[in-house]
Amino acid sequence: LPRKLARWLAWAAIVVLALMLLAAAYLAIRLSTDRAESFDDPVMQFKYGSTGGDKNFGMPYVMWQAMPVLFRKYLPPGREDEGWAAFGFIYEDPAELPDGFRPRPIGTSMRNYLGIERTFLNCAICHAGTVRAAAEAEPIVYVGMPANRIDLQAFQDFIIASALDERFTPEDFLAQIDRMGLELDPINRLALRLIGVYQVRERILTIASRFRFAEHEPAFGPGRFDTFSPAKALLN
């Protein structure tokens, strides 16, 4: 090869190698991320802090936001337009929450794990409720009180019914995410398309197979839940 061409190829190889190393370093940092959202205020930490479930069982936040819209027909009758609030989940006034807070109900946490923002339930889902001083008064949130309106069995049934629906696919989720204007970078979009949605579906159906004992029990109803049987089913 002419000397000039050989020199050009050498520099091109160096540039390509440098770009590959930068890309590898970026992916290594991204995929090693494990950072839960935390709060200095202990009450906020109780309501929205992580108890660890968002790492192994967390659902990508954009999927969480899209599910009650994409599968609204499985929400409780007459409450199809309420989203997660249809199950008694409590939402606070966004004006009273910190800047940059990702909208979600009390009792849910956020964790960036493997580069994807995930959300899952925490203790406050069962241990926070609201009280009105009068019928026309605004509800006041009290942490630590029983969540007397939450219907976790209906929530569980919704999640399972959604996972069994033929629209639980990357194409349908990504289309709904785009319609809602949710932020999703190209890498996470590719991850959801190739594996993320399928992984969430498989995990839901695996958990559902362990919760089949609930089919033989009376419906728990709002404010009641079989606390320890699901935990035993998951851990055994």
Feature names for model-found ranges:
Residues 3, 26, 197-199:
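General helical secondary-structure elements
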Residues 10-16, 43, 62, 69, ...:
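Extended aliphatic helical segments
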Residues 2-21:
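N-terminal Sec-pathway targeting helices
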Residues 25-115, 224, 229-235:
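Extracytoplasmic c-type cytochrome modules immediately beyond a signal peptide or single-pass transmembrane anchor
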Residues 84-236:
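Extracytoplasmic redox metalloprotein regions
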